[in-house]
């Protein structure tokens, strides 16, 4: 079993089905790894940068798929999610992408079905099942995960959010799409340090594309 891979990011591709594929070169071998959008946005293609990706290997009859995450906690939460009936790998990644690990764990532990249902493809029944099956498990190791997860550095200002919302509405996006995009990019600690609305708008459009 591969726990993690450490190497150079050579390519980040987007498939026709909107999945993010990282090509990670390790000892002259290029590994194809599907990663969450939030991780793809934070990776650099600089030649001298070495990154560590925590992996999960899915073996099927016709193929083997590697999924990659920025921390082992994120990877472990992904594994917990895909063990739930009706939650596949893409839904698990969408949950992590839409909410971020801290908000996702909190929503599960507090049985916040409304927040869980913000994720594309997750209806109220699936959200209830996730909370029911994982609430007690996550409560036991929530503190340990929080210690290993980078702490958020703040929240975006109301002025930034309002301008981003107005611009996205003018571009034709729906309220639901805008809420999901803002929820997702607000988990980006690097972006939270940035006071320029242009960068927030660029990140939101990239997430929506």
UniProtKB/Swiss-Prot annotation:
<keyword id="KW-0963">Cytoplasm</keyword>
<dbReference type="InterPro" id="IPR012340">
    <property type="entry name" value="NA-bd_OB-fold"/>
</dbReference>
<comment type="subunit">
    <text>Homotetramer. Forms an RuvA(8)-RuvB(12)-Holliday junction (HJ) complex. HJ DNA is sandwiched between 2 RuvA tetramers; dsDNA enters through RuvA and exits via RuvB. An RuvB hexamer assembles on each DNA strand where it exits the tetramer. Each RuvB hexamer is contacted by two RuvA subunits (via domain III) on 2 adjacent RuvB subunits; this complex drives branch migration. In the full resolvosome a probable DNA-RuvA(4)-RuvB(12)-RuvC(2) complex forms which resolves the HJ.</text>
</comment>
<feature type="region of interest" description="Domain I">
    <location>
        <begin position="1"/>
        <end position="70"/>
    </location>
</feature>
<dbReference type="GO" id="GO:0009378">
    <property type="term" value="F:four-way junction helicase activity"/>
</dbReference>
<dbReference type="InterPro" id="IPR036267">
    <property type="entry name" value="RuvA_C_sf"/>
</dbReference>
<keyword id="KW-0234">DNA repair</keyword>
<comment type="function">
    <text>The RuvA-RuvB-RuvC complex processes Holliday junction (HJ) DNA during genetic recombination and DNA repair, while the RuvA-RuvB complex plays an important role in the rescue of blocked DNA replication forks via replication fork reversal (RFR). RuvA specifically binds to HJ cruciform DNA, conferring on it an open structure. The RuvB hexamer acts as an ATP-dependent pump, pulling dsDNA into and through the RuvAB complex. HJ branch migration allows RuvC to scan DNA until it finds its consensus sequence, where it cleaves and resolves the cruciform DNA.</text>
</comment>
<comment type="similarity">
    <text>Belongs to the RuvA family.</text>
</comment>
<feature type="region of interest" description="Domain II">
    <location>
        <begin position="71"/>
        <end position="149"/>
    </location>
</feature>
<dbReference type="InterPro" id="IPR010994">
    <property type="entry name" value="RuvA_2-like"/>
</dbReference>
<dbReference type="GO" id="GO:0048476">
    <property type="term" value="C:Holliday junction resolvase complex"/>
</dbReference>
<dbReference type="GO" id="GO:0009379">
    <property type="term" value="C:Holliday junction helicase complex"/>
</dbReference>
<keyword id="KW-0227">DNA damage</keyword>
<dbReference type="GO" id="GO:0005737">
    <property type="term" value="C:cytoplasm"/>
</dbReference>
<dbReference type="GO" id="GO:0005524">
    <property type="term" value="F:ATP binding"/>
</dbReference>
<dbReference type="GO" id="GO:0000400">
    <property type="term" value="F:four-way junction DNA binding"/>
</dbReference>
<dbReference type="InterPro" id="IPR000085">
    <property type="entry name" value="RuvA"/>
</dbReference>
<dbReference type="InterPro" id="IPR013849">
    <property type="entry name" value="DNA_helicase_Holl-junc_RuvA_I"/>
</dbReference>
<feature type="region of interest" description="Domain III">
    <location>
        <begin position="160"/>
        <end position="209"/>
    </location>
</feature>
<dbReference type="GO" id="GO:0006310">
    <property type="term" value="P:DNA recombination"/>
</dbReference>
<dbReference type="InterPro" id="IPR003583">
    <property type="entry name" value="Hlx-hairpin-Hlx_DNA-bd_motif"/>
</dbReference>
<dbReference type="Pfam" id="PF07499">
    <property type="entry name" value="RuvA_C"/>
</dbReference>
<dbReference type="Pfam" id="PF14520">
    <property type="entry name" value="HHH_5"/>
</dbReference>
<dbReference type="Pfam" id="PF01330">
    <property type="entry name" value="RuvA_N"/>
</dbReference>
<dbReference type="InterPro" id="IPR011114">
    <property type="entry name" value="RuvA_C"/>
</dbReference>
<protein>
    <recommendedName>
        <fullName>Holliday junction branch migration complex subunit RuvA</fullName>
    </recommendedName>
</protein>
<feature type="region of interest" description="Flexible linker">
    <location>
        <begin position="150"/>
        <end position="160"/>
    </location>
</feature>
<keyword id="KW-0238">DNA-binding</keyword>
<dbReference type="GO" id="GO:0006281">
    <property type="term" value="P:DNA repair"/>
</dbReference>
<keyword id="KW-0233">DNA recombination</keyword>
């Amino acid at each position: 079993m591969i726990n993690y891979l450490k190497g150079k990011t050579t390519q980040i591709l987007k498939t026709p089905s909107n999945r993010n594929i990282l090509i990670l070169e390790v000892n002259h071998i290029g590994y194809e790894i599907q990663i969450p959008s939030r991780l793809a946005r934070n990776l650099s293609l600089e030649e001298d940068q070495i990154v560590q990706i925590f992996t999960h290997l899915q073996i099927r009859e016709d193929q083997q798929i590697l999924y990659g995450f920025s921390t082992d906690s994120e990877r472990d939460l992904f594994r917990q999610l895909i063990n739930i009936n009706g939650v596949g790998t893409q839904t698990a990644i969408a949950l992590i992408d839409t909410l971020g690990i801290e908000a996702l764990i909190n929503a599960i532990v507090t049985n916040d079905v409304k927040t869980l249902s913000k994720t594309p493809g997750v209806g109220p029944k699936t959200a209830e099942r996730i909370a029911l099956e994982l609430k007690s498990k996550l409560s036991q190791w929530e503190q340990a995960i929080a210690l290993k997860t980078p702490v958020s550095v703040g929240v975006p200002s109301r002025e930034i959010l309002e301008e981003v919302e107005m611009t996205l509405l003018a571009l034709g996006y729906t309220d639901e799409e805008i809420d999901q995009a803002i929820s997702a990019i607000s988990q980006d600690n690097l972006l939270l340090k940035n006071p320029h609305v242009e960068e927030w708008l660029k990140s939101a459009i990239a997430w929506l594309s």
